[in-house]
UniProtKB/Swiss-Prot annotation:
Domain of life: Eukaryota
Boundaries of every F-box domain copy: 28-75
Domain Cyclin N-terminal: 300-411
UniProt biased composition (Basic and acidic residues): 580-590
Official protein name in the record: Cyclin-F
Chain location of the short sequence motif D box 2 per the record: 355-358
Organism the protein comes from: Xenopus laevis
Gene3D superfamilies hit by this protein: Cyclin-like (1.10.472.10)
Length: 761
């Protein structure tokens, strides 16, 4: 075609060059491409050591780390302890508001653990530094009771300078320099004064007790709610005789309870059960008591096994059973035991713990709880001895820091015992019913399936079950239903599951086929009227009385497989005696050898040399003030010993097989071995000789059935009292008691001469 004409689009006359498609380079996305707030969040979730590494990667990361204190405030120091190499890292994080760093630094300086200081003036230097970080800890303590006092509580060292006393004096001086008033400064002063008052109240000196009252008044004026409640407790007895003063006292208590003081809420609930002329006041307070029971939430303990990959129900059962035996032999209260188990469960839900350290976690939690609520403490060195020196002194000190920091200082939490005590004040209970309720409550600690119910429901269910087993005509009266908000219909599934787990299913057995019955042995004591020997109604009969279908499939007791099991825990009876069977006989406490009671310093340990066989020669730490009372040094209190060993026993090695009899004397030689899955080999370098006590079983075992006859309680508006009818019990028959069987408190075979120890101290 001629120029200027239109071209067609055929292939002959139109051949336009194809358009090139330019490939765009893909955008390279890196960590630095994230928004700054997201990048900051990533840095805050890193361990402290990794933050330093990230800081060296890029100038932008260095700028974020240096300019944002929140990175260090939220840095994790899990399984890291202060030392001379990382001291600057810990101090920087503490100054930025890192709670974990403050707790660990305070404990490290107090116990001289990890941070070596010259012996000249060690108590003064360490005490001042520990005081500084304990003060920072209370400043950062949000939502928990003031707790640093449990580390400096008496007894104090009577020889030479005492680090605890230095911390106390330093904190007292700090309170003197801080002006009283509202705000963060006043709240900090109130918390520290509360801690100082708690320390002073534990002395036997009357002058110190009066000084403690003055400290509480000053603390309450600075806004400390816990101090105000303690002052109310001291004045409450005098107010009972005067109706006007009682009314004022009752209103104060109601105010403290409404402001969130847990102890005040419990005291208020108990006061509602007393007969007094303030009926109108009680009715208004009854609504708050109902809220206390209804606000109790279930604690999902089954999530423990999500965090603890190598742990199962049986291993937890064995650990709790061992803690019950320790509490029994040391005469610790039921509240202390429940708090210890709660502390263990909460820590295991947060932090992954190697199997070899489960016993360490348990005994460390008991040390913390005894110091928090008991007058008589479990000393660190005695706790180490209870585990047969499986762990060192410094291991327990560090584990205490890990637990306190992981739980953010929240030690005291509502327990079944708290709600049980309230219920015992609401209606009159006979002695045997109260003991049976306590027995059921402690049995409930052993089973994770029961955690589907809240502590308040478990306490109510335990009381209801106890009254049914004792054939009360109206086991759940209208007064309890109105006060707690739990009706008989709501509690029936909980009661059925409690009875099934506690009385119907068989208890797990250890590797020697011995039933783990520490709770049963605990309640065979005359103190509890031997309530665990009572014959209990069978499960079928209970279901018939409650009108629910009976699932009478008994869960088989979990027994270890002889071809594959790990020795887990030894009884706290020492390594020379067997764990007592049910036919054991109770012995008098006075006939026992007392336990080590002194927390010796390095110098004192060098002077004593090999006289004290505590297997702590490698320990470079110690605190001379951590010892027990004078009465314990004279033999008034005894304690067991136990051991944790996770050596794998294989059938290919017949020399390692358990071939003991009940009369043999047992000796344990712990050897640190790893399982085949952990070290990738089938060989072992030694064998563990025949041992007594607890053992774990295969990881797939479970001591209980997973079936549950009911669902957790859901509060419903309104109470239906038409169903609160008497349960038709048959005529009572004479109870058939089992043969009298008591537990023997074992003597320690190691020779610890208390007379010579006192001379050296």
């Amino acid at each position: 075609m001629k120029g200027g004409g239109l071209h067609c689009r055929c292939s002959k006359c139109f051949a336009a060059p194809p358009r090139r498609r330019i490939k765009r380079r893909p955008r390279v996305l890196t960590l630095l491409s994230l928004p700054e707030d997201v990048l900051l969040y990533v840095l805050e979730c890193l361990p402290a050591v990794d933050i330093l590494s990230m800081r060296e990667v890029h100038p932008h990361l260095r700028s974020l780390v240096d300019s944002h204190s929140s990175v260090w405030a939220r840095a994790s120091f899990q399984d890291v302890w202060p030392s001379s190499e990382n001291l600057n890292l810990f101090e920087r994080a503490a100054e930025c508001g890192n709670f974990e760093a403050c707790v660990k630094l305070g404990i490290a300086y107090l116990y001289n653990e990890g941070l070596s200081v010259s012996d000249d003036g060690r108590a003064e230097v360490n005490g001042l530094k520990a005081s500084r970080f304990f003060s920072l800890t209370e400043r950062l303590n949000a939502g928990a009771d003031p707790f640093v006092w449990l580390f400096i509580r008496p007894p104090w060292s009577s020889s030479g300078s005492c680090c605890k006393a230095v911390v106390f004096d330093s904190l007292n001086e700090e309170c003197g320099t801080v002006t009283s008033g509202e705000g963060a400064t006043g709240a900090l002063k109130g918390s520290i004064q509360y801690c100082l008052a708690k320390v002073l109240s534990l002395f036997e000196d009357d002058d110190k007790k009066r000084e403690a009252l003055g400290m509480l008044e000053s603390s309450a004026s600075n806004g400390c709610l816990h101090s105000a409640y303690l002052l109310w407790e001291t004045k409450q007895k005098a107010a009972l005789s005067d109706p006007g003063r009682y009314l004022q006292s009752f209103r104060q208590l109601r105010d403290y309870a409404a402001r969130g003081c847990w102890d005040a809420q419990i005291s208020l609930a108990k006061a509602c059960g007393h007969k007094n002329p303030l009926n109108q006041e009680q009715r208004s307070a009854g609504e708050l008591v109902n809220q206390v029971f209804q606000s109790s939430l279930p604690i999902n303990k089954s999530s423990i096994f999500t965090t603890q990959k190598g742990m199962n129900d049986t291993m937890r059962y064995i650990l709790i059973d061992w803690l019950v035996e320790v509490a029994t032999m040391k005469d610790f209260s039921s509240l202390c035991l429940h708090m210890t188990v709660g502390l263990v469960d909460r820590y295991l839900k947060l932090r992954s713990v190697p199997r070899a350290k489960l016993q360490l976690v348990g005994i460390a939690c008991m040390v913390i709880c005894t110091r928090f609520i008991s007058k008589e403490i479990l000393t660190i060195r005695e706790a180490v001895w209870l585990t047969d020196n499986t762990y060192k002194y410094e291991d327990l000190v560090r584990m205490m820091g890990e637990i306190i920091s992981a739980l953010e200082g929240k030690i005291r939490m509502p327990t079944v015992v708290d709600y049980k005590d309230v219920l015992s004040h609401l209606i009159p209970l006979d002695r045997n019913t109260l003991h049976l309720c306590s027995y059921i409550s402690e049995l409930s600690l052993l089973y994770t399936e029961l955690s589907m119910y809240s502590p308040a429901q478990l306490a109510a269910g335990a009381l209801l079950l106890a009254r049914i087993l004792h054939r009360q005509a109206r086991p759940w009266p209208a007064q309890l239903a109105e006060t707690t908000g739990f009706t008989l219909e709501h509690l029936t599934p909980c009661v059925v599951l409690l009875h099934k787990k506690c009385f119907h299913d068989d208890a797990p057995r250890d590797y020697r086929q011995v039933s783990l019955t520490a709770v049963k042995q605990r309640f065979q004591d005359d103190l509890y009227d031997q309530i665990s020997k009572e014959k209990v109604m069978d499960h079928t009969h209970l279901c018939e009385l409650l009108g629910v279908p009976c699932h009478d499939s008994e869960s088989p007791a979990t027994c270890p497989n002889a071809a594959d099991f790990h020795q887990f825990l030894c009884s706290p009876s020492g390594n020379k005696t067997k764990r007592r069977r049910e036919e054991s006989i109770q012995e008098d406490r006075g006939s026992f050898v007392t336990t080590p009671t002194a927390e010796l310093s390095n110098q004192e340990e060098d002077l004593l040399g090999d006289f004290l066989d505590w297997s702590l020669e490698t320990s470079c730490s110690g605190y001379e003030g951590d010892r027990e009372s004078e009465g314990e040094r004279e033999g008034e209190v005894t304690a067991p010993s136990g051991v944790l060993d996770l050596s794998l026993l294989l059938t290919e090695h017949p020399q390692c097989q358990d071939s003991t009899t009940d009369d043999d004397s047992i000796t344990l030689h712990p050897i640190p071995l790893l399982s085949k899955a952990e070290n990738g080999t089938d060989s072992i370098e030694g064998c563990v000789e025949k041992s007594s006590g607890y053992s774990s079983v295969s990881s797939g075992g479970s001591p209980t059935s997973s079936s549950s006859p009911g669902l957790p309680f859901t509060p419903t508006p309104g109470l239906n009292h038409s169903k609160l009818t008497p349960i038709p019990f048959p005529q009572p028959c004479s109870p058939l008691l089992k043969a009298s069987r008591r537990q023997v408190k074992r003597k320690n075979q190691a020779q610890h001469s208390e007379d010579n120890l006192s001379d050296e101290l």
